[in-house]
């Protein structure tokens, strides 16, 4: 697969916390954990969303926090270089079907569902071929300190350089990587 293209950041700037756009689709407990850790680690463009009917409440809750609340996953997907689907395993298929086609060319997409087969199927079915897939799963709950906890990384459809970038971005969790 050829990565990059119109709208994609050059490889040298994609991993720069000042310019890299990170997206979190799903602001439940795990989405919030990831968003806050990324922001606190200095990633300056963390775009988040939840279900459209929660937009106004989410916007009020996170106003002035350094997170950018967007109306829906289309907007998060279109502008983010690294996107994490933080949704329940039972909803991954419908959420990726809805927002996956909007994914920015050359972006890296991850999912953190606990059941990977439906996630992989949804990604392969609905994501454009010109995006990368490096999935993840934190082996702890949202109220457990992630430091030293296992974080599974799955290099599904991505070259090594994209895997290294995901490792760099997720380093803020201070988790122990487990590769599958």
Model regions and ranges:
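Hydrophobic Val/Ile/Leu positions in short beta-strands of Rossmann-like dinucleotide-binding domains
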Residues: 23-24, 85, 153
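Rossmann-fold dinucleotide-binding core
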Residues: 116-180
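Rossmann-fold NAD(P) dinucleotide-binding segment
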Residues: 74-126
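Structured loop/turn residues at beta-strand edges in well-structured enzyme cores
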Residues: 41, 78, 129
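NAD(P)+-binding Rossmann beta1-loop-alpha1 motif at the extreme N-terminus of oxidoreductases
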Residues: 2-75
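Short, flexible coil/linker segments at domain boundaries that flank nucleotide/cofactor-interacting
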Residues: 15-19, 78, 104, 146
């Amino acid at each position: 697969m050829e990565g990059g293209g119109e709208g994609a950041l050059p490889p040298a700037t994609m991993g720069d916390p000042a310019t890299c756009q990170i997206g979190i689709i799903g602001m439940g407990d795990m989405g919030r954990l990831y968003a806050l850790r990324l922001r606190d680690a200095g990633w300056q463009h963390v775009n988040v969303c939840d279900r459209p009917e929660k937009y106004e409440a989410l916007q009020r809750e996170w106003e002035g926090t350094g997170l950018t609340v967007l109306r829906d996953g289309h907007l998060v997907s279109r502008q983010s270089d690294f996107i994490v689907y933080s949704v329940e395993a039972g909803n991954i298929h419908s959420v990726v079907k809805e927002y996956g086609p909007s994914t920015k060319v050359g972006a890296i997409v991850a999912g953190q569902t606990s059941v990977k087969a439906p996630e992989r199927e949804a990604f392969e079915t609905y994501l454009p071929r010109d995006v990368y897939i490096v999935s993840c799963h934190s082996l702890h709950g949202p109220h457990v300190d992630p430091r030293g906890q296992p974080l599974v990384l799955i290099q599904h459809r991505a070259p090594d350089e994209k895997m290294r970038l995901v490792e760099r971005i997720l380093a803020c969790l201070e988790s122990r990587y487990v590769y599958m």
